[in-house]
Every structure is written in C-alpha cells, then in structure tokens.
Amino acid sequence: GSPPATAVAAPIAANAMGMASKNGKDLRLKADESINSRLIVPHGNALPITGTFLDEISHDIPHQNWGEKEWDLDFRYMKAMGIDTVIDIRCGYRKFITYPSPYLLKKGCYMPSTDMIDMFCRLAQKYGMKFWLGLYDSGKYWDTGDMSYEVEANKYVIDEIWQRYGSKYDSFGGWYISGEISRATKGAIESFRTMGRQCKEVSGGLPTFISPWIDGKKAVDAAGGNLTKEQAVSIEQHEREWNEIFDGIHEYVDACAFQDGHIDYDELDAFFSVNKKLADKYGMQCWTNAESFDRDMPIRFLPIKFDKLRMKLEAAKRCGYDKAITFEFSHFMSPQSAYLQAGHLYDRYMEYFDMQ
C-alpha cells in the first residue's frame, strides 16, 4: 500500500527548511570556527562575573525542566567562564519548594520530585565552587509589603538547611537573604538583622548577602506593560535611605549586590560610586548583580545584548566593586539555554575576556 501521509510530509518539510540529508550527509551550513569578532574596545576591561544565581524556584521565568545531567553540564560551562560561586535564589516560593522540607511540607507546600539543594551542593563540591543558600520566600511580603512575615518560616528553614546540607557539605559556603527590597521597606532592617544573625549563628559565621534593587526609572512592575516610570529615586535619596539600612544591618549582612538593571547606562557610575562608598563606610563587600536579561525589551525576559552587559561590568570595575554575580547564567548565558541567544552571549563574553 501507499505510505502514510506523514511519512511523505516529513522529508518535504525537512527539505523546505534546508536540512534534508543527501546520502546521510547533513546539508546545513556550518560556521567557520576560525572567524573571530573584531573588537574595537579594550578586551576584558571590566569586572568578570564569578558568581551566578540558580533560578530555583522561579518567580517569573519559564522552567527549563533540566535533570541532573543538564545541571552537571551547566556547572561545567559556568566553571569554564570562571564562576566560583553559585547561589540558589530561594529554597522555596509560596507552595513550591526545592527540597523536602519537613516544616514546609507540614505547612501545605508541594513535594518536589528531586532534592535540588542536595544536587546543587554535590555539583558545587564536584566542580570546586561554593554554594550559597537562598532563604524561603512565603510570598506574604510581596502581598503585604511587610518583610517581617518572612522571619517566622525561615526560623525553621535555616535550621533544617544547616542540618541537612550545611553541616554535611564542604561546598556549603554562605547564605542569601532572599527578601528583595529597594527602599525603606516596612520591617526590612529588623528582618534582615534577625535572619542574618540566625544564619550566622547556626553555621559558625558563614557569610550572608542581600541583592536589592535600585528604584530607578526601569523599576516597573514586571507584569505591567511599561518599561519605565516617571518617579525614579534621586541619587541623594538613594544614598540617604541605604545609609540608614546599611547602618542597621551591617553586623549580620556581609555583602550587598545591588541589581544593576533598573537604572540607565549613563547613570551607572553615579549610583555605583554611592553604593561602594556606603559599603566601605560600613565594612561591607560591594558586589554587583549584573543582570544578564534585558529590561529594555517589550518581552519579559530574554538574554541581554552583550554591549549592555559589558558597559555594566566596565562600570563595576571603574567603581572598584569586589565581585560580580549575575541573574542568571542558566537561562540567559548558558550555551544549553532554551533561548538561542544566551549561548551567543556566552561566546561574546568569552571572546571579550580572551577565554576562548
């Protein structure tokens, strides 16, 4: 009988895409690997990215459904780029959790199919990196604007995490206090102090950090349609508010990594120099959270244009920052990302830093 229609349609479709094989040979064109970009800016004149967030649990970025095999390869790509620090952004968000927490399961959270925290600790150990744990986010702060709700759940979570992973893995290197704020948020100073103190007490003084945003003109609701807003914070107001926050938290928070994507590229130096001055004043490390996704696009969120990332990292170097981390490698810079342009960003980055 005649072959089914699909069997006939498949080679026709492949032909139309220019991918049909002739005698088993792939006819797709291949890039000439001997060609490099001709950079007209100085190579590597920027602070290199040495840390990345791991976006588990995601807030507003689609999941890639990786298993341990894919994560293992991603850690190898990170290592090749010079990353020595991986930070789980939050160990749970509302009812989704990354590890089988007895406390959170009792509270009605959903059972995960794998223990991501155990896997991240093992992979960090395997590739000579330090793993930092992001605290649980109940979602109540986002709903109410009051940070103090987050303290209660994390009392139990911090103890669980230390017993299950921190005391067991040498790769467990620190804590990320995951509440994101930008200005004088209700309960923030007290909450950061309380959670930071508990993290340090349980772990024998391991370091802690926060990653707030700057309330700049691109600090708009990710679910809304606008890319910018009228009422952006002034440098003076930013300095005043963060001076007060650092004054209140510096004993229990070792580093601050401001998200760098909410201000314009010609404002970077002004804000960055204030951040560095304040961090120095309070004996804190000044990191930058170099966002590798693009806030200037109408699509939320895709990998950033290389020159934008370059300018942000150049500014961090000019202002004497201590470390650059990114949000986040696996979606926006990884050669195996669901987004094709992420691997190209990786290539441009490696080319710029002469790591090809």
Language-model segments: residues:
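Substrate-binding cleft of secreted/luminal carbohydrate-active enzymes
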Residues: 86, 257-265, 284-356
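Boundary/entry segment of secreted carbohydrate-active catalytic domains
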Residues: 24, 28-84, 89-92, 228, ...
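Aromatic-lined carbohydrate-recognition surfaces of secreted/lumenal glycan-active proteins
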Residues: 131-152, 176-179, 185, 195-238, ...
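Active-site cleft segment of glycoside hydrolase catalytic domains centered on the general acid/base Glu
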Residues: 141-172, 177-205, 210-212, 222, ...
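An active-site-proximal structural segment forming one wall of the substrate-binding cleft
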Residues: 111-127, 146-173, 198, 238-249, ...
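Aromatic-lined substrate-binding rim segments of carbohydrate-active enzymes
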Residues: 68-139, 188-209, 270-278
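N-terminal export signals
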Residues: 1-20
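Surface-exposed, active-site-proximal loop segments in enzymatic domains
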Residues: 62, 94-112, 139-150, 300-301, ...
